[in-house]
């Protein structure tokens, strides 16, 4: 008798639970608002960012169970994060940073997941050009410095020269890697309840 009670209770529990917990439909506008809110809350920036432009997504399906993508542009505002003001009250900074962002919503996950990837506009191409210019300038500067140091170092032992050369390479390598680390795109991933 006791086994029958537990089997019945288990069947009722399974029947009473929805087969899949469907998410609340999310319109394209709501998805953009949520993406901007997530960026402002998780990016760790001092200033708030506001939507500058959104690429229309005619294939956006608010009731989709799969993944959805949206593309948009954010711009830095004059408001600071700690002020906790509404974005509508915040005007854009004249020279504010502009970010190209791509958001991916994964509605098939429980809870749903959003992943944002943002990079400064013109960042990649300009960074490459800046790097090339810096390398040229460094090479020219290095040649001049080397000529001056050669005159001074004629009397120094070879060991000292080798160490200086080695540490110069290490210094350049560290600088280059630090620049790359700090210029990588920002990627944020969060789950959100419906």
UniProtKB/Swiss-Prot annotation:
Tissue occurrence: Expressed by the venom gland.
One Pfam family this sequence matches: Cathelicidins
Propeptide stretches in the record: 23-160
Any single GO BP term: defense response to bacterium
Gene3D superfamilies: 3.10.450.10
Region (Disordered), start-end ranges: 125-157
Ranges of Acidic residues composition bias in the record: 125-154
General function of this protein: Potent antimicrobial peptide against Gram-negative and Gram-positive bacteria. Adopts an amphipathic alpha helical conformation, that may allow to partition into the target membrane. Low hemolytic activities have been observed on mammalian cells.
Family to which the UniProt record says this protein belongs: Belongs to the cathelicidin family.
Extra facts: The putative mature sequence has been predicted by AMPA, a predictive algorithm for identification of peptide stretches with antimicrobial properties.
Name of the molecule in the record: Lachesicidin
Natural source organism: Lachesis muta rhombeata
């Amino acid at each position: 008798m006791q086994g029958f009670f537990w089997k019945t209770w288990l069947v009722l529990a399974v029947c009473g639970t929805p087969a899949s917990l469907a998410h609340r439909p999310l319109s394209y506008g709501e998805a953009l608002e949520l993406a901007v809110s997530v960026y402002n809350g998780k990016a760790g920036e001092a200033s708030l960012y506001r939507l500058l432009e959104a690429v229309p997504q005619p294939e956006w399906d608010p009731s989709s169970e799969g993944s959805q993508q949206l593309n948009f542009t954010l711009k830095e505002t004059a408001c600071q994060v700690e002020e906790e003001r509404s974005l509508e009250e915040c005007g854009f900074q004249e020279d504010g940073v502009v970010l190209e962002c791509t958001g991916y919503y994964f509605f098939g996950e429980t809870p749903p997941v959003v992943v944002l990837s943002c990079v400064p506009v013109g960042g990649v191409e300009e960074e490459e050009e800046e790097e090339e210019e810096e390398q040229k300038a460094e090479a020219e500067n290095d040649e001049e410095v080397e000529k001056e140091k050669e005159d001074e170092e004629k009397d120094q032992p070879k060991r000292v020269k080798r160490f200086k050369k080695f540490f110069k390479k290490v210094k350049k390598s560290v600088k280059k890697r630090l620049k790359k680390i700090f210029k990588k795109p920002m990627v944020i991933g969060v789950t959100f309840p419906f």
